[in-house]
Amino acid sequence: AIKAHGVMQKDIDYVVKGIETDAGVAAGSRLEAMRQRRREYYLDTDRNGHHQLEAGDIAEARVVSVIRPGAFVELFGIEQFIPLEELSYLRWVDATTHFRVGDRVLVKILELDRSDRNNISLKLSVKQAGEDAFKQAISRFKVGNIYVGNVTMITAVGVFVSFENVSCLCQFPKRKRPAIGSPVTVRILGADLERLRLWGAIVYS
């Protein structure tokens, strides 16, 4: 289920703790605001005993920090790190080239443990929140057909080529290995829609 709560339109970043009317200054607490969010979305229940968020739900999170190996996001008062491999089905090497602080992203809650009310733990994924769209994209590529893409990563297992937001693992070409970022022509040798993978061979680079 996708959680489209109205609170996302009016985020509470700070709880006002006091106002100095003469100076026109308000004192706020971000930690208190985050505690309120955690209580509302992870701990409180409705009249039927249901929590607002459960594992498997999709919700909107806010990027609060980005480093090369991944991004930190805040989801209703909890900050959680999402590693590079859970940000995209594409083979990225640096998250800072794709995300900025303040970005809004949809995330899928893979795991949610609230057994310790003071230390709620989450496991989140950006790429799995868009899994259906990725399946539609990957299904457009037919085995035997030739497509043009760009090299995004070279590893010990082969060359990753990206086209139309889909990655394809290719065998090392017999000719000189292409450089990262260079355009190449790829023949699709196989597709696995269940595991969301393509593999092929570079026929021109």
Annotated model-derived regions:
Residues 1-205:
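Single-stranded RNA-binding regions, centering on S1/OB-family and related RNA-binding modules
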